[in-house]
Amino acid sequence: SYIAVAQGGQIFSNGTSSKPVVFTSEKGTPGSWGGIVLCGKAPINKAKSATAEVSELTYGGDVATDNSGTITYTRIEYAGAIFNNKKEFNGLSLFGVGNGTKIEYVQLYAGSDDGIEFFGGTVNTKYIVSNENEDDQFDWTEGWVGTNEYWYGKEGRNKGNRGIEADNNDSNNNLTPFSNPIIKNVTLIGLGKDYVGEGENQAIKLRQGTKGQLENFVLANWAKGIDIEHDVTLGWTSKDLLVKNVQFINVNTESSGKTSAGAAVDVTKFYSKANNTGAGNGVDTPTWAKGWTVGL
């Protein structure tokens, strides 16, 4: 089971800090149900329109301001069910969603795949908690260009892959519009700098041509902080791709890079270090996330 909103449809899930809306499962285990899927009419780089990998609904178009509704003070728990033998749901999957949509104060908790994933679109977000999801806490691809503030991501359950996985397009890294989000004030916490288990234990993976302006990040308890791959991504200047003011705490390797052919390269030009508060309280739970979330 899952909830899907087709193009032209809208969802209104509006809780409060004391009474959040909760989408959950009686089983209380990751992958118990599919999660929430929104399909909008905003631009993507896969084609003018495409079929969503989960739900098989159409998404994409040329309406940057498309409105798929409002999700505020909402928890999505234990999502990530298998859709077919190749694809799993995320907690919240945003396919070509426009910036007329409001997504603020949302938690993605204990899913079996990613917490939240953006497939193109222009949607913006604020105050997002993504924790204990078993793959990536945050993920984007297919030309997403949203503006975002205050993300708090935390691995858990002895599983997890990356805090952020960022792509432009896996079949052609040069497709436009390029993924190019603005993201400020973020804390990403891993399972430990010496953790050995499932996943790559990376805070941020930037690859397949993505751009982005990331600012004020705290990366704590990871084997690797920032990893950048593929020639198109590595060809950007700091005006196109930059992690500005990043603080590394208990991170074994701050950064690494690899060309499309697999050769190691230095990527220090893509980030600058500085002490900052990340999502609000450094590694601690931010004040804005208290009272309506779980598992922190």
Describe each model-derived feature in a short phrase:
Residues 5-8, 15, 24-113, 117-134, ...:
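Extracellular beta-rich repeat passengers
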